[in-house]
Amino acid sequence: MTRSLKIGSLFLSGVFLTTALTACSGGQTGPATLTVDLSDRHQTMEGFGASSAWWSQEIGGWTDIGQSGKEVREEIMDLLYSEEGLGMNIYRYNLGAGTGTGEKPGVFTDSWRSAQSFIDDNGNIDYSLDANAVWCMNRAVALGADKVFFFSNSAPDTMTITGMPHSEEQRKKVTNLAPENYQAFADYALDAVEHFRAQGIPVIAISPINEPQWTWQGGQEGCHYEPDEMVALYKVFYQEMLSRGMTDDVELDMFESGQFGGSKFKKWFKALAEDETLGPVLHTLSGHSYNSSFADKEKTAKWLKKNYPDLKIRCTEWTEMTSGRDLGMDSAVIMADMICNDLKILDAISWTYWLAVSQYDWRDGLLYVDPSEPKPQTYTLTKRYYGYGNFTRFVKEGAVRVGTQMDRDKELNSIAFEQDGKLTMILVNSSAENERQVSFNIANANYQTMTTWLTDETHDLEQTAQTAYSAQGSVTLPPQSIMTVVLE
């Protein structure tokens, strides 16, 4: 059950202990076996997070006092970043492109899709701007976020060809940033990185190009780049970072691809990867999972591992892209299935959700807020929020993914990690009708206890069992459920 609160309880619902999982009503198919190979070690995780785009510039100003005695903005950030909440450790700060303090030039679907830059009405740098979003970033860091990524959808509108942070209808597949402004954009972005690092913000990467494959002709911030234009801009960024001595501390993130796979991936990727200057210094590819099928990702992963075996991958954006708000398990199990697949197929070292907070009639935010104006400072938690917690609260930085194999089954998915002597398994049952029993086959396991945490129709990331572990241990997954199993 979701909650609509002024400021709700921070803690993730009531916790109760039982000696076994309670069987659920409904259909049941045959049992499945999850085999875990502790010696089959894959990527080491950086963590999980969310993007600040489109919500932090408003939520950071929500200073009403709620039932807990805290400001609403504090409660929301606690839910996302405190250890009693989701405990995320990655924050993607959107380096906005709208200059000045008044209405921003451009054609936007709504006010949330225009983000403020640090350029004031007189063209001067002012780091007191974008104050609400900066407050959210500072709060996330105070709560434990130790990795901040700066990303730009567009250069500031004062630098663009159209004078807006997007192109125009008649300018299809044409960049909006002239070459003579590449240096100005690099200076602006890197100045911001240096400023906030000096303030104690752990900015570890800068991503100046976001989904360059698309045309970005209005509706939100964005900039198209052809592959050669992208390479030219990246060379300016890299040379400027070298001259500032930043390359040891701040990573120049390879472009954030709008998809994993297809010609629109390879063409842009190869332009950077095969460049004599950039290829040797770009070590991590960020990509978005919106427009990529399971088969696309498998094909891309195989190609990357063969040709670029040292490349690391971060999955930096995903949401379901389906209209209609959903508070329940339908979208939660789709999200959990996507996370499992991205981490297993792509060996992604991190996974970052797109909209942490949404005002839209889409299956997107982890939390929803009211779209009416002026907005009441209330929010609603979703099952996606709790389901994301099945990953974020248990799989921490330094966890190593280990090999898993499950009987071929379209309804079930799984993933496992080892860290500090613990084995954490996340199981997903996407069937709306059938509960599923899953037994474990773990060679050379020396665990004493098994604890389970469940998100389903009636549980919000609740501890549902704590028992002695046996080699023939098993769990029962209710229909449409996400379960975290921790062996110690």
List each model region and its residues.
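Aromatic/acidic polysaccharide-binding cleft in carbohydrate-active enzymes
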Residues: 312-393, 402-410
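Carbohydrate-binding surface patches
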Residues: 407-446, 480
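C-terminal motif of bacterial Sec signal peptides marking the signal peptidase cleavage site
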Residues: 22-23
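C-terminal beta-strand-rich structural cap/linker in extracellular carbohydrate-active enzymes
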Residues: 466-488
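Structural recognition of the beta-strand scaffold that forms the well-ordered cores
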Residues: 44-52, 88-95, 147-151, 204-208, ...
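Bacterial N-terminal signal peptides that target proteins for export
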Residues: 1-11
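N-terminal catalytic cores of secreted or lumenal carbohydrate-active enzymes
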Residues: 31-204, 224-231, 235, 239
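Active-site neighborhood of glycoside hydrolase catalytic domains
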Residues: 184-191, 195-202, 212-318
